[in-house]
Amino acid sequence: MAKIERFYDTFQPEHYDVYVDVDRAKKTIVGETTITGTATQSEISVNQKYLVIDEVIADGKPVEFKTDNDAEAVRITLPNEGKVELRIKYHTDLTDTLMGIYPSYYELNGKKQQIIGTQFETTFARQAFPCVDEPEAKATFSLAIKFDEKPGETILANMPEDHEAGGIHYFEPTVKMSTYLVAFAFGDLQSKLTTTDSGVKVGVFATKAHKADELDFALDIAKRAIEFYEDFYQTPYPLPHSWQLALPDFSAGAMENWGLITYREAYLLLDPNNTPLDTKELVATVITHELAHQWFGDLVTMKWWDDLWLNESFANMMEYVSVDALNPEWNVWELFQMSDVPAALNRDATDGVQSVHVAVNNPAEIDSLFDGAIVYAKGARMLVMVRALIGDKALREGLKNYFAAHKFGNSTGADLWKALGDASGINVGEIMKSWLDQPGYPVVTASVNDAGQLVLKQQQFFIGGGEDKGRTWQIPLNGNYGTPQIMKGKKLNLGDYKALRTENGEPFRLNVGNNSHFIVQYDDKLLKDILQHADQLDPISKRQLLQDSQLLASAQRLSYADLIPLLVEFANDESVAVISVLYRIANSLKQFVIAESPEEQELREFFGNLSRKQVKRLDWTPKATDSNDDQLVRPYVLNASLYAHDAVSIAQAHELFEDNDDDLTQIPAAVRGLVLKNEVLNFSSKGLFDKLMKAYHETVDPSFKQDICMAVPNVTDPELVKSLVNDFENADVIKPQDLRAWYRGVLANEESQQFAWDWIRNEWSWLEATVGGDMEFATFITVTANVFHTPERLAEFNAFFDPKVDTPGLTREIKMDKKLITGKVDLVEKEKTAVNDAVAKEV
């Protein structure tokens, strides 16, 4: 297994002059990179991948070199150590891998067009130009770009253009930065521009296939977010401009290239007249996430990839801090509780999960660090925990000092904890060590013992079994009975329960606000007290009660059947924080029934009972008077009514479809996906299938594309399913960036599942060649494991993935997902009778 060499140890670049000549028609790249730096020995290496090195010149004289493709390097022999100017000439192909320099395709007026963009994180700058491609190897960069330019085309880069001469566009030198943040793009683009109060130019760029007003929302959010961050961080934005660019083909969600942030179109552009609130919230949080990186990740960067969480966890928290300040009426912290928190709690409960801080020993493992549920979601939750501990005043002061101390340089987690600790007077590093370096999280049991004492105990929580290694965490308890701020040991006695209950006058609860990364299991006495006063709980506390209960049931620490009465209790709550988790639990009940069985029929009736009052209250037509919660709750209850085969819902959705049959984009976007799903489920035909796939191909509206992607995989006609699966490998129909969503949709449909499962097994080599370098490649395995829950599928999963378990970057995912499916199989076997009996009692 290849080990990672640190080329920075022997060669420290200071400045790059990067010349690149891109010919789109010939699909070629010719380049020349001049690196000024210091060699600490005569034998040095710089990174390259897929580059053909033509010549290496050191201080004006050709020198010996050897290309080492296994190490993604070019080995160079210098006359002596010390200051050196390296000039490296090379050429390579322009490929469609979505990494390095690559073309991005779209249609305009029926003709296929392309723009060129870049994606260099994690280690893909080396596919564009020779460099020391390590985060610590910060340098300045002067870009000179030539391309087969057509009149009216736009070229963008990290810094403003200085001048153009001989068809070459020369850009101002960058500030000191890491290679993975270098970016440029060119093509036929439209834009909208503004300027912040402090003078930073802000722009949004997209292809001309989009309507101009689709750029407006992003421009407003970006401008206000930069102004917010400059104030919150008390540190100026360090560059002259901040460009936001939507690329038609993009592997990640977005990328924080300094001064030129790139996005999937779905995460930047939206129709201001017909976009649901949840999509606006999503786009806003993606933009503010990337802009948070301009300081945290770009200005100050982790030394090595094992501290990736420093970048991503912090940006993940700050996206909510900023959007909450920009649009407080959205209550966006509820979105955090609905997305990041459950993602972290579920993933982090599987034995074998990575810790937030994890060592990297193999180049192929770097991309596997981007575990969204851990590095992003759990890490953000850790920082939310810290914020709650120290408060915003200390947080802002600590960050100001942190940026001042490390700007244009690198840092570690210890540097951040020190800055926050100095500002708050709290030893943040000591508290956070257990959360950063240990995988998993604790369940805290709260019980009244025989002596009447209220006792807390902590132990690691597992779903699907796990090896208890006696881990403990320093837990911010956030109790409502004056509990200690931090629980350090395995056991804590809080005193006489009766006296505490009388003194406090309310049920005992821990983790109030749900900011700390643990769950609580109350004994029967304490839980009964909470449920008797459930109407006094705020939405987050109700959500927390439901969420913790499901996790405990999934771990078989309580019966899954005990969740059924809780669903009935909270079914008519009007908060999306509650309803979203309620239907998450309700949908999980489907694993306990066989399709079209009497048990499933009873489950459908149960869904009808849960959703009936809410459907009547909200119906299928969004109204101007809808509250934010109404807008967000509606899709959950309408989807439930469709599963219930509710005749009124089916008819109303069908009517909306027919009323807009000539232009499906005019269906209210808040319900459009469900309207289309209803057609596929209940009025399916080849004509409908062809109509929707044609619309998918022709539209540039990302929201409409997602609605079609949600609906079409519900098709059951075998010939239509075959046709759809065949298009998985046709990039003109389904772009590789969107393939996972289509695969998941077909796999989740029991009647078409076999087609998708056969496809991924038969076409694994194609999938690996197409998206194998993508940081989300392993999530195709995750998606599969999230769907499977039967012994037969577990056996097939093991048979296919066991031989791949030693593949770098896939090992952890395969091992964890085997445990995940095994746990579900065991749960269903043990609980299905009790669950189905409990459902039957409610119908």
Language model feature labels by segment:
Residues M1-E32, D54-D59, L98-Y102, N109-I115, ...:
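N-terminal, polar/Ser/Thr-rich
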Residues I29-G37, Q453-Q458:
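Short, well-ordered beta-strand segments enriched in hydrophobic/aromatic residues
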Residues T34-L51, D133, S142-D148, F461-P476:
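Surface-exposed beta-strand/loop patches in extracellular or lumenal glycoproteins
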Residues Q48-E107, F129-P130, D496-E503:
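A surface-exposed beta-strand-loop module
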Residues I53, F171, V204-E467, P598-N609, ...:
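Hydrophobic alpha-helical and helix-loop surface patches within well-folded domains
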Residues P62-P79, G117-Q119, T123-R126, E265-V286:
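Aromatic/His-enriched, Gly/Pro-containing loop or helix-boundary segments
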Residues K89-K192, D216-F217, V360, H517-I519, ...:
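Extended, low-hydrophobicity, Ser/Thr/Pro/Gly-biased non-transmembrane segments
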Residues A144-F147, K192, A206, A292, ...:
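Non-catalytic accessory/interaction domains
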